[in-house]
């Protein structure tokens, strides 16, 4: 038998999938993705520090006990079109917790406004 929490999550993802399938533009999908990921709060003990790295906006995300001497560089997914440091804070918190390291996530430029190789240049500069 599925728990109440699992049933709620399954229904939430079914609804999200149905909503996403009706979207036709990158802007619509970005708004939907921000709203969807905004449902998931980062724990209160997460440390989020906004920084600039090589001209690119970035965030350090750390779980309690993360070593200052260990770091993970994370390039978020999203097909170079969606996603940001904000949309990936929660997974980065859990990556920090599992690895014992701080996680640096870059907020690189996205297409179609910044076509290839703009996002790669920002990542390599960082």
Where are the model-predicted features located?
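Short beta-strands and strand-loop turn motifs
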Residues: 58, 75-76, 105-108
